[in-house]
Every structure is written in C-alpha cells, then in structure tokens.
Amino acid sequence: MKISDGNWLIQPGLNLIHPLQVFEVEQQDNEMVVYAAPRDVRERTWQLDTPLFTLRFFSPQEGIVGVRIEHFQGALNNGPHYPLNILQDVKVTIENTERYAEFKSGNLSARVSKGEFWSLDFLRNGERITGSQVKNNGYVQDTNNQRNYMFERLDLGVGETVYGLGERFTALVRNGQTVETWNRDGGTSTEQAYKNIPFYMTNRGYGVLVNHPQCVSFEVGSEKVSKVQFSVESEYLEYFVIDGPTPKAVLDRYTRFTGRPALPPPWSFGLWLTTSFTTNYDEATVNSFIDGMAERNLPLHVFHFDCFWMKAFQWCDFEWDPLTFPDPEGMIRRLKAKGLKICVWINPYIGQKSPVFKELQEKGYLLKRPDGSLWQWDKWQPGLAIYDFTNPDACKWYADKLKGLVAMGVDCFKTDFGERIPIDVQWFDGSDPQKMHNHYAYIYNELVWNVLKDTVGEEEAVLFARSASVGAQKFPVHWGGDCYANYESMAESLRGGLSIGLSGFGFWSHDIGGFENTAPAHVYKRWCAFGLLSSHSRLHGSKSYRVPWAYDDESCDVVRFFTQLKCRMMLYLYREAARANARGTPMMRAMMMEFPDDPACDYLDRQYMLGDNVMVAPVFTEAGDVQFYLPEGRWTHLWHNDELDGSRWHKQQHGFLSLPVYVRDNTLLALGNNDQRPDYVWHEGTAFHLFNLQDGHEAVCEVPAADGSVIFTLKAARTGNTITVTGAGEAKNWTLCLRNVVKVNGLQGGSQAESEQGLVVTPQGNALTITL
C-alpha cells in the first residue's frame, strides 16, 4: 500500500502513529521487550490518552532476529500460521544501557536507540546493515475504509539490490517494484505470481521474512526509493531479519527455519513428456508418442497424463474416463514395462457434474460460504467447488483417492492450481480466510506429498506443483506455470526460476517450448536446450503436442543431444541436488548468489549458474546471437573446449546443438557412462574432467549415491607443476581428462591417451601424480 504522498505528505485519509520514544525496556526470559510511545512521555500528563507500542525481540535460531511490533494485543489472531522451526534454547545476549537497548543472536543484533531520536538498527558484528529511522514504522489508520495496518521501512544502502519475494517474472532485481503477496493464476507474462513468498534478500548479505500468511504489501525502493516498505492489515507486525553474510548463508538459515527442499528421486531428473492439455489423446496416442521417442532414440523417463484422463466437467474426482481409457490399470502396467514412470494431473477442485459431488457436499468436505451454502462458481469447471483441506475427513477422502491411483501404478502427481482461493468463506477449522488464501497451496501440496511419502516412500516422492507458500519448498518440484511459446516468455520463465531460487526453493522447471500457442521450431529448439539444462525438464503444451518431430527433424536431434548430456551430467547434478536438500542452495541460481563480490553479477537475469561450477546462458534468438558475462577466472566450454577469460562480457553465435555452457577454473567435474537414463550406477566408469587447476589450488569432486550421500571423492591438488590426485571410497574404472592439456612431462600411477578434449589418464589405483 502507498502510505506517503511524496516526501512531505501522506496519502489522503491516513493517520500515522509511530514509536518515537523508548519508555521502558524489560527482559522476559529470552526476549527483549521495548515499550515505545508515539510522543515524549517524560511528563506524566503526556502518559495519558496515548497508544504505547510493544516491541518484542527474540531469536528462533542463531543468526535470526525476530521483531514483533504490537498495537492492540487483544485482536483476533486465527491461523493458519507458517510452520516454522523455532528452537527454544537459542543463545542470546541482551544489553540495556542509557543510550540503547540491544538484542543479539550470533553475529546479528537489533539495537533500539533511546533519547530524542528514535532508530531501530540491525548490525552484523557491530556494523549496521539496515534498520529504520524516526517515523518509518508504526500504525496506519485508514479512515477511507476503516481498516488498520502496521508497517515497517528498512533502509537500502547505495548500490543495494533486492531479490526474491517468490516466483516473479518481472525484472530479477526488485528495486522500484510494488509487490502484493497474493497468489494469483496470472501466467508468466504479468506482475502476478503463483508462488508469493514474503521473503527477500539483498546483495548486502541478509534476508527478511515477514511472518504473515495474508497479503503483505511491499514497496521495494519505490514509494521511498532508499527503503523497503512492507505493510499488513493487522494490529501487529512480525518479521525476521536473517543474517548471512553471503546469499548462500542467508538461504541456509532461511531454509533451516522454514524447511529444507526434499531431495527428489534420481529418475525425476530425466525427460518428462505429456499429453498436453486440451489435445485429443487416448492410449493409442500415448503409445504413438512413446514408441516414436524410442524409434528416434530419444530417451524418455516420465510420461504425464494431463486433465482429460478424467471425464470432462468432473475434475477432480479421480476416475479415469472409461471411453478414452477403458483399461487404465493395464495401460499403466504396459507403460511401466517400457521403463517409464507415470504422472497424472490433479487439482483441489471438483466440478458439479461429478457423481461424487453430492456425497462431498453432504459430508461437509467442500468449502462453504459464511451462510452455510457451498462456495461455487463457473470458472474452470461448471459449478466448481473447492476441497476444504482443513477438514481431516475431507483430507482422508482425497488422500484415499490418491492412494488408489498409486496402487494402480501412478508414481507422482502434478498438483496444479490452488491459487484462486476465495475469502468470502468459512473454513471447517475456523481459519482466517485472508491467511488461508495463500497458505492453501501449502496444505494442498503437503497432503499430496504425504500420500506419496506413505505409499512409495519419501525417497521416491516428487510432485510437479504450481502454487506455493512459505515452506512449500519441502515438496518439490515446482514449475513456472503458463508461458507463451516465444523468446520473451522463455526469458520471463528464467527470471521466475531465478527468483524462486532466491526465495528458498531448490528445484524448478518450466514448460519446454511454451505452454500457450505453438512455438516456431527455432524457439522450441532453443527452449529444449535451456529446459534440459534446468533442474527438471518437461515437454508440455496446451492445444498442441510437444513431441519434437511435430516441429522438424532437427528438433529430434536437439532433444536427443541435450537429454543424453543431462543423463551424463547426473553425477554433478545430483550432488548439487543433495546440497540443495542439505543447505537450501538452489540448483539453478542467479549469478549474484555464486559471485556476491562481483557487482557485475547483481543484475544478470539471462544466464545462471547450474550448481557451483557451470554457467549456462540460454539463447533467446533465432540466429543464435547471445551475450553473456563471465566472472573472474578462466572458463572452458563443457563440450566445445574453448577457453575464455572472465571479468568481461562475451558475444557469440550458436547453432541449435549448442549454447554457452562454461565451466569455471579449478573445477573437477564428473560425467557418467550412461546417456540413456538419469538413474544408473554413477560410480562405475566415471569420467572426471579437470578444468584449469591453478597453482596452490585444490579441486574436489564428490560422486553421489542414489540417496544423496557421497560414495566416492576425488581430489586434485596442484603445487607448482605437480598435480596430485587421490580418490577415496568406492569407484570402478574411472578416468581423468586434463582439459586442454595435450601432454605432460611425467605420470605416476596410471597410463595416458590422447583425446580431442585433453589428455585422458587411466589410473592403476586411486592415486596419481602428474607433472605438467
């Protein structure tokens, strides 16, 4: 919401009350409580007829400081609330002096100044990183609509850039934007978002989570150009400042607090193909797709049935359309015999035509209006109603239907929709409708996730989810929603992926080739390269099929090349996936996350790091022209082998079987021996590649097992012209390629052979000494 009218005025009809003077400071257990008045109350006369703010400072985890600014404490505060991991034994220090009161957790502290000039400052090791000055937080009375709000304005320094706030398709850097955290089904071409997360971080190495599930209004360097303002309709405002000091460290703390991304199963990293949305399909159509992929030597790993696996107008009652799929169990069995995993589409709604609609209504499993009638409308499905997942019996009914599908052979679910949740309703458990609007996405996906956890096991559970709220990163994978089939939408999708990664989500995908309309072949081929260098890869569309031969013959070559490449890269990719699970670092990440000390990376949103060591710059033109930036160092193309210097921009032109994919120096990268599947024995026949190991540096490569643990570790250390290589753990028949090295002066512990990419060393054991 806009509070100010320029620098001097406030918006008409608003009355602002600010904490201006510290009246008293108390320590209550591990909390510091500050009572602050909106005027000078040293005279007793001024202690009457005035509000008194209560500011509570506490720490749910080390390095995280919570702030709760309260006006009326007796206001209703119904749930839902975010499921946060709050620890009770966090070590804090509280200091109360004549000049200030300070609360400290880890290296982060919050300091409230006493005396004439109010300020609330956040410091890291005594150095201020942000805060709010006089008249920049407090209470807003809106006489236009008789509503009350709380707000805070945190300072932005010179050159400070803001990221996150969920999956957003606008410019990656949020400065200058107004953001309302209200889930909407808006596609990728608008300011609306499927996944609103009231969490942001900055390039100064801290993050802020506003702990309110309802709509939070952010003015990010917009209303006040050097401040992030956030406001909420409430009698209190609670937020957490999360220390870094690096972007990765911020996400580590944030996901420890709100939940780690689960580790998806290895097979989910392969290629997914779907029926598309409104296309005509039956078992014969499905078989033609799958057999066509096999005939063209196109690896395929997951097949997805979209909405029309059920009868029209009845979504979502979980019954196969008997006219289109008369033998679903047999069909699924036949498809799985071909080595495929099966996914089906679901959503949390039910059409009035469904035979089970009356049963659901009578049992109270559907969302009601305050007068007791069902909430219904005719968008999406005629007479559509919404499952009330605050009713445990409704959850059980829904879960039992899903379990029946799993018993039939379904491996996972595309959990679509969940954004357009109304507020003129009465939830079964009395939840606040304003808060449940966004949080519904969490309980919906949690329910489906738990079904898979209870049936196939947590290590095999995976979703394909569109909507999300805080904590939903625990239920991967998420995809970017409805995009158009053009380069602009491809770039929008990438911005959304980088944005959601900066909001705590580890795994992300998008509709390769675009969802709406049918892409020209050149767009499809460029998008395939981008899509298969994403954490998860799915060919999906709306009114047309996405099989590559529907475009041209070269599209088959492109899909084949990049699918095979991804399968070989699984050793690297799954180790990065395990790190996402352990630390919250997204697999696909903005350049600023990996290179926070390089200011040239702050605004980059047309390229990304795929894991720690590989830079990818998708091509957004038919001709193949692409510009990209490489940070400091010497970078090598993953398969072309050309080397480029960093700390500069580069301009190239690429065919459809290529794009900029550069590996940073001092990297030891593992490639597997199987280009047909993502799930195979990764520690057998591993080809390690050593890129530009510099004197005094060590490169380490960890080969994962299917559970994400490390099964083999290879290290290469260089001193002068000598490289010492040692392996530990279980590995068979591995080799080491010294990229762009054509000969060496000495080799102990193995044999050597020439290759186009560099000298290939085959060890006799697990130790090598190489003299350059």
Residue ranges: model-predicted function:
Residues 77-93, 368, 638-656, 746-765:
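Solvent-exposed beta-strand/loop surfaces of large extracellular or lumenal domains
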Residues 57, 199, 293, 335, ...:
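Conserved, mostly hydrophobic/aromatic
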Residues 764-772:
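Surface-exposed interaction regions enriched in Ser/Thr/Asp/Glu
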Residues 449-462, 468-479, 492-496, 500-510, ...:
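Catalytic core of carbohydrate-active enzymes
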Residues 70-72, 81, 299-559, 594-598, ...:
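Aromatic- and carboxylate-enriched substrate-binding clefts and catalytic-loop regions
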Residues 2-43, 49-99, 140:
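A low-complexity, Ser/Thr/Gly/Pro-enriched, surface-exposed linker/loop concept
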Residues 2-4, 15, 47, 70-72, ...:
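Catalytic and substrate-binding clefts that recognize carbohydrates or anionic sugar/phosphate headgroups
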Residues 34-36, 57, 69, 102-107, ...:
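Short, well-ordered beta-strand segments enriched in hydrophobic/aromatic residues
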